[in-house]
Amino acid sequence: MMPAKLQLDVLRTLQSSARHGTQTLKNSNFLERFHKDRIVFCLPFFLALFLVPVQKVLQHLCLRFTQVAPYFIIQLFDLPSRHAENLAPLLASCRIQYTNCFSSSSNGQVPSIISLYLRVDLSPFYAKKFQIPYRVPMIWLDVFQVFFVFLVISQHSLHS
């Protein structure tokens, strides 16, 4: 016959094993549920994949609304190939020039320049230069570029 203390130790060990076995069973049930519901657990990951680019776009738009260009010059000038007897509508070159606030230059003081050259029918504005000396929000320059691109496409479709 076993001593009482040894019997008590064996009983405690058996109870502990039984509790541990139940816990293992609970863990396996959890893993089974996790396997079934893995889509739900993956949703935050997919949302993060979607929201990071959206956040970057919103940050960029916020910068475009808040940053300003120190100057904004539009120059319209005649093409050298135009002759006085040519009755075709004037194809002028439009140059939009403004500072690019997002790119840094070598010395950090002179900003780089972006120029957009477009050929559009702008006869009424021939040989004019418009200079807007005050500071313009960058978003307006984006809108202006879209407008001129649309103008070029519409002119191209009219002449073809």
Curated annotation (Swiss-Prot):
Transmembrane segments: 39-59, 136-156
Lipid bilayer topology: Multi-pass membrane protein
Alphabetically ordered keywords of this record: Membrane, Transmembrane, Transmembrane helix
Entry's localization field: Membrane
Main subcellular location: membrane
Protein's UniProt keywords contain Disulfide bond: no
GO terms under cellular component: membrane
Family: Belongs to the UPF0479 family.
Note: Completely overlaps YHL050C.
Protein name (record): Putative UPF0479 protein YHL050W-A
Organism: Saccharomyces cerevisiae (strain ATCC 204508 / S288c)
